[in-house]
Amino acid sequence: MFTVKNVKSFQGRQGIGYICDLYRNNEKVSTIEDYADGGYPYGITRYAAELREYGKTIGLAYSEEIILNCIVDSVENNVPIETMVAEYKKFLG
């Protein structure tokens, strides 16, 4: 299971960016940096495949970026991941 802590969000060129700590099974495994500049987030390459597999378990079989954004949004909005997955599915169709 993945989660994030210490989320700091900010306005980037192409939306809201963030920096956070990524945890897998309650162990910090990476610091993620998404500057909302259209590029790939720093710090997730090593965990991309695992994030995609985790996405399947929560019903969100999309890219690691979308799955990570969903996790961050659930933490920032203080809602269960299942609630945020339902919101993402509405948007993603």
Give short role names for the model-derived ranges.
Residues 1-93:
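Terminal leader/tail segments of proteins
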